[in-house]
Structures are given as C-alpha cells and as structure tokens.
C-alpha cells in the first residue's frame, strides 16, 4: 500500500492528541510521558505544525487512513545558521508497523526537507534495541554513524542510541 505525507489538518488534532497520549500507540521506544494539556493545539494555531525549527506531518495511506506521523526539529552543530541540521522521527500506530511504511515515510520526509529547506544534513536516532527502525532508516538512505551512550532518558532509565545521518548529496534510497 502506498502512502503520502501531508500537513496536519484541524480535523486530525483530536486523533493526534489521543495517539500522543497513548503509551501503547507510541510504543516503548517513543513514549516520553504526557505532554501539557493543549500543547498540540497551541502549536497548531501558531504555525500549523510546520515551523522553521520543528514540525510534524501525518502519514496517510492510499485508503485515507492515517498510519502515524513524522516529525523534525532543528539541531545546531555550530553558532551559525549553516550549521543547522534537522533530526527526524517517526511514530507509526501498531497496526501499521512492519509493512515498510517507516522506511517510505522517512524517505519522503528527507526528500521534503531537502526540497524545501537549505539544510545539508538530516539526522535520526533510535534505541540500540530498535532494530526495526535501524533497518527502516538504512532503507530510507540513512548511514549509521555512532552509538550515543546514555543519550536518552525514558521509562525510568538512560538508553544508548544509534545515530544516523543523510546528507543532501547522498544517493537517494530505493525504498
């Protein structure tokens, strides 16, 4: 089944709030606790969840059902604007995991960010135990760079993360 990324619509907000507040829907590698009430709607009113420093797009299947969302946020590797990169992420609902949607959605997000921003570098990180996401990133054209020790605090403890990157000039993936 094919998919596309699209901007979040006002009609999606109730569903996104339920997803983001549901530990089961987020999965054990994406659950970081509850967000303040109303935060999603405040961000939507501010910039439609498509800001210059962070944003979200929904993953929509060809039948119109939503499978999850992808996100990006700016990270800086120096004080100047040219040192900005984006870290990307994905959250798929349990029923849509294991079907190749993660690789395709992250490939599309990379293409979108390279087409509409001036960033040279995209990054993604995932738990060292999340081998499904590691495979998805590699299929989406990302290169494994490093293991970041105790880089993420979640579920009462620190977790090692695998860092991936994709540069503007890297050969596109063949998802």
PLM regions and their residue ranges:
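Conserved GNAT-fold acetyl-CoA-binding loop/helix
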Residues: 24-45
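Acyl-donor (CoA/ACP) binding surface of acyl/acetyltransferases
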Residues: 1-22, 56, 63-175
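Amphipathic alpha-helical interaction segments
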Residues: 27-28, 39, 52, 122, ...
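Short, P/G- and charge-enriched loop/turn segments at secondary-structure junctions
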Residues: 43-48, 77
